[in-house]
Amino acid sequence: ELLKRNAEFLAEYISQSTGHTLQTEALAPGSEAPKGAITLGLDPAIGNREGYVLTVKADRVTLNGQTENGVFYGIQTLRKSIPAETKATSVLLPAGSIQDEPRFSYRGMHLDVGRHFFPIEFVKKYIDLLALHNMNTFHWHLTEDQGWRIEIKKYPKLTEIGAWRDRTVIGRNTEEYDNTRYGGFY
């Protein structure tokens, strides 16, 4: 199931960036992909759970990971090889092979929305960029005395009161405020 989702994700990215629509389909065991195909697969011989091997040949691209996560990180490498939003009629990738695995098991970034609210579209873009750079952990700081950003139906006052502030300090260590209501929640 995850391998299929990875294939659909890659096909959608290629469609958005080049305008080409790719078909995704499962191959029967032992069968060979047609020329020009991008093949995703699992290979338990790859040494790291998040490792992958990406091979580009004149007639096909093969991407194997030890797990679906490894395939996902290989897709990110492939994404970085395709110019974003080219709408070109073709994309030429140099032939070669990349064998990659993470040096560190924990690779993450933090987003503090407790102190400063970010719109949902920004958060989605941020997560997409984390994936593009092979980060595997997103630490989302949702609560703080400056803002409560997660709705809990049983406690509505947390967001009615805690998600908003009536003003924001201007600069540092000043008594000046902008008197603009600010905040939000997810």
Tell me what each language-model feature is.
Residues P102, Q146-Y186:
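Aromatic- and acidic-residue-enriched carbohydrate-binding clefts of CAZyme catalytic domains
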Residues Y13, S81, Y126-L129, H133, ...:
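Generic, well-ordered alpha-helical scaffold segments in large soluble proteins
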Residues R107, I127-D128, H139-H141, T159, ...:
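Catalytic alpha/beta active-site cores
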Residues D112-D145, R149-I152:
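A conserved hydrophobic secondary-structure block that centers on an alpha-helix together
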Residues N64-G65, R107-I120, T174-Y186:
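The substrate-binding groove and active-site-proximal loops of carbohydrate-active enzymes
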Residues I98, Y106-L111, L142, G147, ...:
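Long, contiguous hydrophobic alpha-helical segments, chiefly transmembrane helices and signal peptides
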Residues R60, I127-D128, Y182:
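Mature, folded catalytic cores of secreted/periplasmic enzymes
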Residues E1-Y106:
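Contiguous, structured surface segment used for ligand recognition
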